[in-house]
């Protein structure tokens, strides 16, 4: 009995720092109808039981607010509690609705307390607000964004709200496109967060050679650039994927076969090693968007459109993607900003024509509020209310059409070496999963604890 208890304890330690893997979940279906608790539960249950996987047990939310309400708590929260699904909470920061998001956050903490606290892995203040605030975002009619100074104030406000509550120890970050992170005009946000949420879609990098054959390379480069500005802060993969159907973008072709290739070459190395929320479990219910990224079809099912088993993921693909996403070992801050930026020169001239989709099913509406239509179409309405004013647009584009993924200025100390530093990246030089940001591998202290337990077992 004692042996069994010690072994169980050792396994608990070994899995306590496992990376989170899950999907993004909006508060509406593709026809703009609301999702309710039963709908979220069905999605979470399907994700946990996907054929060929160990289960996707985490959910990233874009908003705290139930669709079409003013500040009611999103019903994904009781659904997550019922299904034991961990949560990356999101507060929609654009469009003037932050007060309502804060109200919903406070209500959720008060209503669910420790039940919520034990499931929340992080809080994202905003989603792609800096992208929408950029020149590129304005050109794409992506909707209303937030300038970096305002976003920093929102981050401070959320820290104040959760202090002394069941969420007091939860880390706070922001999610944005990789080329928004590398834009030096947004460096204040990098400084304000605990971690950086990375959104990157090689499929949309249409100004470059973005066929599926080059997708892994584009992904690695964009993650490396993000790590260069992150320094010793973790980078979480908060959105990526490849569409199963829809129109082509440059050399990129949407197909089930290509979606599987991207899953094998990019997703499989990340899963279990880096905190990752894939886009998306299902986006074709009841109507199919163009393009469509869902790995299950129009009927929610545990049977995916392609094999998710990762048996075709190669060692070379794994080590390369791992290295691109590498930071410090869990619980360690060993890789400083100067080390992380040293390899960025290799990709200083890389860029995206469009580093992200300008749509997404189930997000808040085009006008930047939760009262929008729930969908970002490929070309949103060009109405004045759907675009940031000229004065609100960042001085530097997160991604210029001519090349560099960062603005021309030197930016923060973490990025100042991008164009002049030499040598290989500190991240890229390691193929060890222990170097992952958000790694499932053990930190030194945790590893020591596990070793101690097994030494005790051996002595009995």
Curated annotation (Swiss-Prot):
Per the UniProt entry, the glycosylated residues are 183, 312, 367, 373
Catalyzed reactions: Hydrolysis of (1->3)-beta-D-glucosidic linkages in (1->3)-beta-D-glucans
Post-translational modification remark: The GPI-anchor is attached to the protein in the endoplasmic reticulum and serves to target the protein to the cell surface. There, the glucosamine-inositol phospholipid moiety is cleaved off and the GPI-modified mannoprotein is covalently attached via its lipidless GPI glycan remnant to the 1,6-beta-glucan of the outer cell wall layer.
What top-level class of enzyme does the UniProt entry assign? hydrolase
Q: Which key words are in the record? A: Carbohydrate metabolism, Cell membrane, Cell wall, Cell wall biogenesis/degradation, Glycoprotein, GPI-anchor, Hydrolase, Lipoprotein, Membrane, Polysaccharide degradation, Secreted, Signal
Q: Which residues form the propeptide in this entry? A: 431-460
Q: Where does this polypeptide localize?
A: Cell membrane; Secreted, Cell wall
Q: Where is the lipid attached (GPI-anchor amidated serine)?
A: 430
Instruction: Give the membrane topology, semicolon-separated if more than one.
Output: Lipid-anchor; GPI-anchor
One Gene Ontology BP term is: polysaccharide catabolic process
Which InterPro entries is this protein grouped with? Beta-glucan_modifiers, Glyco_hydro_17, Glycoside_hydrolase_SF
Could you tell me the EC number(s) of this protein?
3.2.1.39
Q: Name one GO molecular function term.
A: glucan endo-1,3-beta-D-glucosidase activity
Q: Does the keyword Lipid metabolism apply?
A: no
Q: Which residues are responsible for catalysis?
A: 128 (proton donor), 239 (nucleophile)
Covalent S-S links between cysteines: none
Name the residue ranges with Low complexity bias.
Answer: 380-437
| Region forming the signal peptide | 1-18
Q: What Gene Ontology cellular component terms go with this record?
A: cell surface; extracellular region; fungal-type cell wall; plasma membrane; side of membrane
Q: What does this protein do?
A: Glucanases play a role in cell expansion during growth, in cell-cell fusion during mating, and in spore release during sporulation. This enzyme may be involved in beta-glucan degradation and also function biosynthetically as a transglycosylase.
The entry sums up its family as follows: Belongs to the glycosyl hydrolase 17 family.
Q: State what protein this is by name.
A: Probable glucan endo-1,3-beta-glucosidase eglC
Source organism per UniProt: Aspergillus niger (strain ATCC MYA-4892 / CBS 513.88 / FGSC A1513)
Write the lineage as a comma-separated list: Eukaryota, Fungi, Dikarya, Ascomycota, Pezizomycotina
């Amino acid at each position: 009995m004692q042996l069994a208890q010690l072994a169980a304890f050792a396994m608990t330690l070994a899995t306590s720092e496992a990376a989170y893997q899950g999907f993004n979940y909006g508060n509406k279906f593709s026809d703009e109808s609301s999702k309710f608790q039963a709908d979220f539960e069905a999605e979470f249950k399907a994700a946990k039981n996907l054929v060929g996987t160990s289960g996707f047990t985490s959910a990233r939310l874009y908003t705290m607010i139930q669709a079409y309400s003013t500040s009611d708590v999103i019903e994904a929260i009781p659904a997550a509690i019922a299904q034991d699904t961990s949560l990356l909470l999101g507060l929609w920061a654009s469009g003037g609705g932050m007060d309502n998001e804060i109200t919903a956050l406070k209500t959720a903490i008060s209503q669910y307390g420790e039940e919520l606290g034990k499931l929340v892995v992080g809080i994202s203040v905003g989603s792609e607000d800096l992208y929408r605030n950029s020149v590129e975002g304005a050109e794409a009619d992506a909707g209303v964004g937030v300038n970096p100074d305002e976003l920093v104030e929102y981050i401070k406000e959320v820290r104040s709200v959760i202090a002394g509550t069941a969420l007091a120890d939860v880390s706070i970050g922001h999610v944005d496109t990789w080329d928004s992170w590398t834009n030096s005009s947004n460096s204040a946000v990098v400084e304000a967060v605990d971690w950086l949420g990375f959104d990157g879609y090689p499929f949309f990098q249409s100004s470059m050679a973005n066929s599926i054959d080059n997708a892994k390379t584009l992904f690695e480069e964009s993650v490396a650039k993000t790590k260069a500005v992150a320094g010793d802060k973790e980078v979480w993969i908060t959105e990526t994927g490849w569409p199963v159907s829809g129109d082509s973008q440059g050399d990129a072709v949407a197909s089930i076969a290509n979606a599987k290739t991207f899953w094998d070459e990019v997703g499989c190395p990340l899963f279990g090693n880096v905190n990752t929320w894939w886009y998306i479990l299902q986006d074709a219910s009841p109507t199919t968007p163009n393009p469509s990224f869902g790995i299950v079809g129009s009927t929610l099912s545990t049977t995916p459109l392609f094999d998710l088993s990762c048996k075709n993921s190669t060692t070379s693909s794994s080590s390369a993607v791992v290295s691109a996403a590498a930071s410090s070992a869990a619980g360690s801050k060993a890789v400083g900003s100067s080390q992380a930026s040293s390899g960025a020169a290799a990709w200083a001239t890389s860029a995206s024509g469009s580093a992200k989709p300008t749509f997404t099913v189930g997000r808040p509406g085009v006008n930047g509020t939760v009262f929008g239509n729930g969908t970002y179409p490929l070309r949103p309405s060009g109405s004045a209310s759907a675009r940031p004013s000229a004065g609100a647009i960042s001085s530097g584009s997160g991604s210029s059409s001519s090349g560099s993924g960062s603005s021309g200025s030197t930016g923060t100390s973490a990025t100042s070496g991008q164009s002049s530093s030499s040598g290989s990246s500190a991240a890229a030089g390691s193929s060890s999963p222990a170097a992952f940001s958000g790694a499932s591998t053990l930190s030194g202290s945790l590893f020591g604890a596990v070793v101690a337990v097994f030494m005790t077992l051996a002595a009995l």
